[in-house]
Amino acid sequence: RRVLFRSALYRKLTAQLGVKPEDVLHIGDNAKIDVEAAKKAGLHALLLPRPADVFMDVDCTQMANLGHGCLAGFTTADAMQPLALRCAQGLAANRFFDDGYAPATADSAFAAYPSRLGYYAVGTHLLALAKWLLCRCRADGVKRLVFLARDGALLRQAVELLRTDADAVETDYIPASRRCLLPALMANPTDWAALPVRWAVYTPEKTLKLLSFCTLDAPESELRHQAEAAGFPWQSPFQEKTRWESFLRFFRDKLYDGCRHQAAYSAARAYYEEKLPEGAACFDMGYSGRLQAALCQLTQRAVPVYYVHADGRNSERLSAAYDFPVHCFYPMPPAMSGAFREFLLSSDEAPCVGFERQNARVVPVYAQEGRNEAAHFLSTCVQHHALQFVRDFHDTFAGTGVMQSLDSPGVQLAMSLPFEGALRQLPEADAELLRSIPFEDMVFAGEDALDLRTLVRDQSAEAALAAHEMGAADAPSRMIGFIPEQTGLVKRTIGFLLFDRETFRKKLRKRMHRSPK
């Protein structure tokens, strides 16, 4: 190896072959010996990196370092140590890095491939969430777990893949959205001021469309005339919150139909009473507890809920008010939440906007809206590969200690580090995946689509600023690396002492055993 690095062997080789160095192309997997030394001898040289080198960020990609930036307060070595996470990295490396020419760049984690984002980052988190749910249901004695649309579609499939004979829980999937639960969310007049909407993007027209379930059955022209006569331009957004609140008071006094509201409430109640029987629990992404409080109000039962995380204040207040237990995967809200998390994990099916009675049965009514093909392709590809990771992990490690270790809450959280790293520190090259992807929230955004790429960038900047203001330096996404094969003897010794003392002791014992003097 030393002779190779000094280029002498390359010169001797070309001399014996009787060829000019510039006519030789040397290909190898070591950047210094196979490329730098060969070039010093005048040869052309190309690097064909080993799959493990590509995955572990040796000149190629940030993929293996995802999650490092979420580790404020403890060391990378401790957090990334669980065997299950290292096995997950092995699966990802085997799947995507068996070709040295696979596109990978130092400023990217996934080379803007949704398959890589889904398989590694989303897949590890999906596996951890599914194992957490199964463990919680087993411990809590839950026999029926209902996944609320659209957040629970993918996770339900993962739970079904991992469920064993020891897991007696049955699963179901039902629609639940702020839009279809508005009759319950607005059951009390005091709740009207706390509607989960972004009032600044609403107009009187959009507001009446949102509240159509309890608006007087009158022609739109008549509703418009009354609104404008009261000083509310039909298509002008509310400039101040006081104007929004004034319009709600006007609506309550002039345009509200209590009978239609009660009919919508009764239909929703009949549907959820059937779908959420005694002993059932729900899964929802989170966060405030409003939807769960509405479900408890409709069913007249305290229905437990499992969240990825809660927002703290509102969820605690509503949990106490409606007496429903809240169990969270994360003990505290993570730095990045909301739109991007839901986009990666939720189904892109049409949202439920209400319920209607058909032949003595209550059935959900879905929005009639066009589908964004770019968003559909991205979410479908990401979720397909995430579920494939869960399937591969189960097929490879079922019945082993690796799978059993996932019952530990600490290992479950560690498995989610790549996902949190992707949310919080998505490299710019990979953020191009989100270009032209709208995030649509019919209630919050008033049917206006939020730009997902901009939203993620803004949330990431806010998270970094919050960490800075709290006095915690945001850890970089690329940590200090130590590659013994590419380091001199003195630096290698120092590196082992700093980063891997156990390996240093083993090497020292081996060296002394070979040469005791």
Language model segments and positions:
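Acidic, divalent-metal-coordinating active-site segment for phosphoryl/phosphodiester hydrolysis
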Residues: 30-45, 292
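Short, small-residue-biased leader/transition segments that mark boundaries at the very start
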Residues: 3-4
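Conserved beta-strand -> loop -> alpha-helix junction used to position metal-binding or nucleic-acid-contacting
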Residues: 167-184
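Conserved Lys-Pro-Asp/Glu-containing loop-to-beta segment of HAD-superfamily phosphomonoesterases
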Residues: 8-34, 280
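Conserved phosphoryl-transfer catalytic core
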Residues: 55-74, 193-215
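Long, contiguous domain-sized segments
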Residues: 99-105, 110-126, 184-186, 190-193, ...
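Short glycine-rich phosphate-binding loop at a beta-alpha junction
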Residues: 142-149, 280-283
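Flexible inter-domain linker/hinge segments
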Residues: 51-129
